[in-house]
Amino acid sequence: MKNRLTIGLLLAAIYLFWLLLSAPARLLALTLSDDARLAQTSGTLWQGEAHQASWRGVELAYLRWEFGFSTWLPGWHIRFNDPSGLRGQAWLHGLNEFVVREGRLVIPARLISQRLALGMPLEARGQLALTLPEASFNANGCRRIAASAVQWQDAALSSPAGLLELAQVNGKLSCTPAGALAVALTQDSHQLSLTGQGVLTPDGRYTFNGTLQPRQAAPALLTLLVAQNGRKDEQGRIPWRWQGEWLSEEKK
């Protein structure tokens, strides 16, 4: 009797383990927050893909995931390569407070400019490359970011005021005590010098505070517009403040 019970429990455990391993990928959608969505899924919880995914209004195609280990920690390795040019990969660990490791993200600059309430026709060129060795987030937003780097490569801005050619824009990400995402930027080209810090809150509001300094090679109309924005300091820099709300797909 005892042997039969042991065998029965063993078979039940094997069956449950098999059910867990073969759990369909669509169950993953049940664990996501309200601002995230997966559709047209295939595979399992442990290795699969979604042909449609979105997070806070950002749409992705062909999101793939695979369970594994990074630095001896269990987690999911995700990667995506959207037709828009947005692509990236990272390791995700944890549930309530998740940790991002070995994150790399490439974003066409035009995608970001389309999400900002600029108030004037402005086309951003180039691409942003983000490296995120380690970061942690929870329901309240950003908790910690270590040794990050942001680079705007082949940077340029096209507007009715003229074409503004930028040097490579360098930045560093951090978290504010309130859980917002902050980025410190520097850029110095033959047309414009720019320094400042931007903040993006969990509810999608952003602000940027910094200084601008047009160079001699800057378009004349742009120099005039910048000069009207404020008074120069003793080094010729003009204060610049910019704020707005990150536009969802519906508001674009």
Curated annotation (Swiss-Prot):
Keywords: Cell inner membrane, Cell membrane, Membrane, Protein transport, Transmembrane, Transmembrane helix, Transport. One of its GO terms (biological process) is protein secretion by the type II secretion system. The keyword Zinc does not apply. It is found in: Cell inner membrane. The chain crosses the membrane at residues 5-25. Residues 26-252 are periplasmic. Its main location: membrane. One of its GO terms (cellular component) is type II protein secretion system complex. It comes from the Bacteria. Pfam families: T2SSN. Residues 1-4 are cytoplasmic. InterPro entries: T2SS_GspN_CS, T2SS_protein-GspN. The keyword Protein transport applies. Involved in a type II secretion system (T2SS, formerly general secretion pathway, GSP) for the export of proteins. Required for the translocation of pullulanase. Belongs to the GSP N family. This is Type II secretion system protein N. It comes from Klebsiella pneumoniae.
